Amino acid sequence: MNPTTSGSAVSTLEEKNLGRIAQIIGPVLDVVFPLGKMPNIYNALVVKGRDTVGQQINVTCEVQQLLGNNRVRAVAMSATDGLTRGMEVIDTGAALSVPVGGATLGRIFNVLGEPVDNLGPVDTRTTSPIHRSAPAFIQLDTKLSIFETGIKVVDLLAPYRRGGKIGLFGGAGVGKTVLIMELINNIAKAHGGVSVFGGVGERTREGNDLYMEMKESGVINEKNIAESKVALVYGQMNEPPGARMRVGLTALTMAEYFRDVNEQDVLLFIDNIFRFVQAGSEVSALLGRMPSAVGYQPTLSTEMGSLQERITSTKEGSITSIQAVYVPADDLTDPAPATTFAHLDATTVLSRGLAAKGIYPAVDPLDSTSTMLQPRIVGEEHYETAQRVKQTLQRYKELQDIIAILGLDELSEEDRLTVARARKIERFLSQPFFVAEVFTGSPGKYVGLTETIRGFQLILSGELDGLPEQAFYLVGNIDEATAKAMNLEGEKK
């Protein structure tokens, strides 16, 4: 990582390599430069001037193609309203650079690294270009290790890999945001790490809601902004495709600085990775490339790879990425989600059925998967416990139809015991979150992996068969469940 320390991201404006706009097609500009002064691919170009009404214009573009005849084709990072042919264009001589480091925490940025939260300027002495190659093999940390989140259902059944990529699947209103905020909170407390949130092509309202909830839950500290645990980068639905295509790289660049220079563990959230592909598809068509399968860009897997390969563990620190995945028309074979799946180490699937039952986090224990759940990685004890939990829940799922029609009494003794334990497991998979304290009033719990395994082993062994199932609902470790059972017993008397 070689961040530059300069007063401005635009370093060579003094030399002023000037061109002029020759053609504008929506967010794509063709610019003519003097002979021998052609900018490089990915150079940032700046258009400054006034529109026909006299309003100041300041549009940054990125060079995508060199067309010949001293022409380049560039994609705008903001709206091209008011631009006219013949306007002056300045070649900055460098790629887009964004602020990095502690100054970014608690702040909201756009794709260019400009703050958009009305909290004043950001210290831009340390900036970093958004385009760079993935770390070399020799720098990578190849040791497979679990990233403990303190969330029981995740750590036991679909553990995250340190420096891995996790797909987050779930519809609206099943608790994606709260789960994301809890992960941000836990990485800061347990791992001394920070988080970067990249809002890629999603609703502006949701971005605003997330910001407000983060302030309310303390993830962003309003009184002392430097104490915040997260930096936010947004390029939402209303932005041109150039911004939506690059905002993921802006967020990743900020995360890389925390990993490589501060040597921290970083969580990078991308919401939504599908919109990154969608924006690339729009830009590809505007640049005149021949579309590939289902109308996507021919460079789909290259673009995805160049983003995903930068998300990894090095010997300095790690970037663990959690990516919300929108599946168009629920078609998992669509090229966009199919290309994403090739990069994922784990999937966390949120279930509306569990949310309706009031079991939070509403992570589906049977649908969520992880490549880390192997005995040689997590150990025999963890693996065996996870498999037995899944078998018990699977059997309960199979018996539900019989229970619905005939009732519990028609089941065999063994099946009744399985159902009772499965219901306890289901409730024990819920837990109170720190970030939800404000709403629920019950204090949050971080449960270590060994405690989680011990708790489920006790339920499976039958030692806790005598306890009522509500004792297992929204508690931390198993000792709290037994204490809650005693309280319930006392209340009955």
Swiss-Prot record:
The organism of origin for this protein: Lachenalia pusilla (Cape cowslips)
Keyword Zinc: no
GO biological process, one term: proton motive force-driven mitochondrial ATP synthesis
Protein name: ATP synthase subunit beta, chloroplastic
CDD domains: ATP-synt_F1_beta_C, ATP-synt_F1_beta_N, F1-ATPase_beta_CD
SMART domains, per database record: AAA
Subunit structure: F-type ATPases have 2 components, CF(1) - the catalytic core - and CF(0) - the membrane proton channel. CF(1) has five subunits: alpha(3), beta(3), gamma(1), delta(1), epsilon(1). CF(0) has four main subunits: a(1), b(1), b'(1) and c(9-12).
NCBIfam families: atpD (TIGR01039)
Similarity section: Belongs to the ATPase alpha/beta chains family.
Role description: Produces ATP from ADP in the presence of a proton gradient across the membrane. The catalytic sites are hosted primarily by the beta subunits.
Keyword presence, Ion transport: yes
Subcellular location, record wording: Plastid, Chloroplast thylakoid membrane
GO cellular component: chloroplast thylakoid membrane; mitochondrion; proton-transporting ATP synthase complex
E.C. designation(s): 7.1.2.2
GO molecular function: ATP binding; ATP hydrolysis activity; proton-transporting ATP synthase activity, rotational mechanism
UniProt topology in membrane: Peripheral membrane protein
Domain of life (superkingdom): Eukaryota
Keywords of the record: ATP synthesis, ATP-binding, CF(1), Chloroplast, Hydrogen ion transport, Ion transport, Membrane, Nucleotide-binding, Plastid, Thylakoid, Translocase, Transport
EC class: translocase
Catalytic reactions of this protein: ATP + H2O + 4 H(+)(in) = ADP + phosphate + 5 H(+)(out)
Binding residue positions for ATP: G170, G171, A172, G173, V174, G175, K176, T177
